[in-house]
Amino acid sequence: MKQLLFILAMLTVATVYGQEPYSVRMIRSEMQRNPDATHLDGRGGERKWNYTTGLELKSFLDASRRYELPEVVEYVRAWADTMANEKGEIYKYKKSNYNVDHICPARIYFDLHDMYGDQDKRYRRVTRKIREQIDSQPRTQSGEFWHKQIYPHQVWLDGFYMALPFYAEYTKRYGPKEQKDSLFADIVHQFTAGAENTFDPATGLFRHAWDESRSMFWCDPQTGLSAHAWGRATGWYAIALVEVLDYLPKDHPGHAVLVEQLNYFLQVLPKWADPETGMWYQVLDCPGREGNYQEATCSIMFIYAFLKGLRMGYIDRAHEDYILGLYPKFIDRFIRENADGTISMTDCCAVGGLGGKQMRKGDFDYYLSEPIIENDCKGVGPFIWASLEWEARHNIDWFPSREGLPIAFEGAEGCGKYSVGGRGGKEYVVTSLADDGSEGTLRHAVEAEGPRTITFDVSGDIHLREPLNIRNPYLTILGQTAPGKGITIRDHNVFITADHVIIRYLRMRLGTAAGVEADALGARHCRHLMIDHCSISWATDENASFYNFADATIQWCIISEALNASVHHKGRHGYGGIWGGRNVSFHHNLFAHNNSRNPRFDHPKLYWDNDLLHYRGTVEFVNNVVYNWGMKAIYGGEEGWFNVIKNYFRPGPATRNLDGEWLDISTSETTSMIKGRFYIHGNSYDISAVEDGGFEGRKPEKLKIANQGHYYYNVSEPKRFEVSVPLLDEHAPYAYEAVLKHAGASHRRDAIDRRIIKEVRKGTARYKGSITGLPGIIDSENDVLK
């Protein structure tokens, strides 16, 4: 993501597309109220290393990852750079204070380091410096962190969030391999011991704090417990759980322990909520008591923890209706529309603590004595996180408009239309077909850094020695510049994880020579991808799989002849691809002679960690041609959103089912039992190639075909799902002709593509699998290289 500065220059002048969702609206509102981040939390421009600002800015960065808000990233970065110098020295930070609150704000420096790398080394230095505090943080005899040096022997629930998400993320990123298990065990112990020591058996809740010494005036001299369960303290506990679980390995014994604790909250907290609004009280264990009030920050913390727990699978779907009902109730109760277009969060407790100079004794009257304010950072941050969960779950999207900006190239369409590629950068000329990484090779140019465009002075086959991974952003590969027959990549896969990549007029024909099980081409965890006029075939897994990515277009490609009974460990696996993502366009592509997955639409189990927030949403599948599938054409799409518009489906000699089913809206227990949502319009089903008998002599039944058409009409969504750049579609028969004329590396089609196009047009298959005997669906590239 080192390209953020470049994107900033492009996008800050742009208008917006669509209505801003609540997460973005709250960020905009906060930035309007606070000209820079030193004004957040009522600081009035005063610099302070404080957890409240760090918490809110962390949520800003998370929203920026979903919605691409470079000006917001700069807002965060300005504060981060103000608070720490290039040596990583933090303004007025003293390790000797051993204040766990001072650990929390360092989390944003992980994200900034990911974005800017070693361009600014302060980000890594800050996290290293804060990590040193944990090593010597004083602890109770049972191993929990003291809350502060000035609060000796005290464990506050607040401290769970202040220290443990940072501790867990640092351990995952940088912890010594041989120590990780024990470090994660220590993190889990902080929760389990802290929960045991703060638990109130009378209510099933957890008290705000515990004093191991039993000497503080605010604690019970027998138990060491404070007087009440405070709403926000319990909220800190809840969100600490879901944040730490992001980093704790699933096979670590502590993972199940923390999931159990989260589910315990779901079991007990609803009993203490207001029965009418569903929200929680400032003094959590005294709902409805005179003077007590429904408090926003604790309520949104619980809602965020439950929403995230539901998405991550920590919480059973049986609780889905209850959890999904909470967020709208919160909006109704606590979010106010302001006359200037901003929004505000009401009824936030300004602060809550125990002891100290204020002699805070933690009784009911104390908690009610603290000021009630609006837009408290401690509520705004969790509100943005909860909103992101809600927006991703309901496919609520928003895009900065790129109208007026240069497009990738003439003819670029769809959501990847504005990919920058290597524009304005260095030209690398490929002069050798070798794959040793030396200057003049494709690998050397791909692995270079900075904006770059790759052209070719040679033609022929590049036999990869290992996968070609495109990790560095701002890259254009122009296969059409090669002389003669062009460029074909063989033996290993090409895999893209970089933003702003354009690939045009290449052939990827994997084959079995290397004995690898792989896709020929794939992409994950990237944005602004454009794949144009490529020919992709002979893969031993899927030919081409694109999902878990965003703002992309795959257009005018041929995806053909995935090898079926080949080297795949599962056996027959001649699959076209898995396609999905968020705000992506697949148009004018040809699928031919693939046994299944033409394509398979994605499902949620293909996404991990927080990818569903950023990389899953609307998919457009428009004006594509699918020919001679074996088992299935399109299927899947569980829990997704798809526009399937004016495609052309042509069963061939290997197609088993001729009853008009070209889209199987399927579910399974291993993926999800919730069907995807589809807008289905204008698709064609052409039986002319099999009218006199297809696979095993089967003939199409027109009544079944008609019934299938009625089914698609009935299950279709009434409106097309929105994307940033909707495709201008054409009628399916016209698209069919255009695809056959122009798809693939068509500037100079090779014999393979020419044969494929001829077979699609004639409704035939010249070759068959040498093992399976399926017409057109081959088992080895040698089945056609005769």
Kindly give the residue locations of the regions a language model identified.
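CBM-like carbohydrate-recognition segments
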Residues: 6-10, 21-54, 66-78, 82-108, ...
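Acidic Gly/Asp/Thr-rich repetitive segments characteristic of extracellular carbohydrate-active
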Residues: 407-454
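Right-handed parallel beta-helix
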Residues: 474, 479, 499-510, 525-538, ...
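Oxyanion-binding "anion nests"
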Residues: 238-287, 291
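Long, well-ordered core segments of solenoidal/helical folds
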Residues: 20-39, 74-92, 125-144, 184-210, ...
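Structural detector of coil-to-beta-strand junctions
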Residues: 493, 520, 543, 565-566, ...
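Asp-box/WD-like beta-propeller blade repeats and closely related beta-sheet repeat scaffolds
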Residues: 122-162, 509, 516-541
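Extracellular beta-strand-rich solenoid/capping regions of secreted or surface-exposed proteins
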Residues: 442-450, 462-478, 486-504, 510-527, ...
